[in-house]
Amino acid sequence: MASKLVFIIIFLFIGCQKSNTQFIHNEIFQFNDIKFDTVSKKLISNVKIVTPDEIFISEFISKWFENKIKTNGFEGDLIVEIDKILMSEIKELNYFKYSIDVTINFKNYKKNNSSKTFSVSASEFGVIEGNFAIKDQENLKKNLIMKSIKNIHNKIAQSI
């Protein structure tokens, strides 16, 4: 009888444990270098950075700018302006929606008073429904932030 009781208790203990499985994992994005025909580059932010998500995207854009936006010219300046970052999230029971809109302006100034301006925007959103962990929400946010910058990266690479 005692062995049956131990077996039942072990079975209940194992069966009642909540799964720790994450539904959304961090994605890995690869960025190629983008080369501009300028001598210098500068990053300017026209948005107010307050929330942790805004801090994350600001730092991510700075790293992307420093590591993947390259200059290889003899004259001119590249000014990259973060023009807009809008984020919204809706949290309800068993439902989470996150959206992000980003606009970045690329201004290429030359000495002969010619300039080119590219205004590039990206919008992303994601939804989680059902049983999910807070880590899933954070992973969704980070993935969407990086995906929006990847879209901007691809659009500007095609434009120049």
What are these regions, as identified by a protein language model?
Residues M1-A2:
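N-terminal secretory signal peptides that target proteins for export/translocation
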Residues L5-I14:
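Sec-dependent N-terminal signal peptides
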Residues C16-N32:
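Bacterial Sec signal peptide processing site at the extreme N-terminus
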Residues N26-E27, E54, A133:
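Alpha-helix initiation/capping motif
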Residues N32-K84:
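N-terminal segment of the mature soluble domain
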Residues I61, Y98-I100, L144, S148:
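Hydrophobic alpha-helical membrane-association signature
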Residues G73-K135:
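Surface-exposed short loop/turn segments
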Residues N131-I160:
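C-terminal/domain-edge helix-coil "capping" segments
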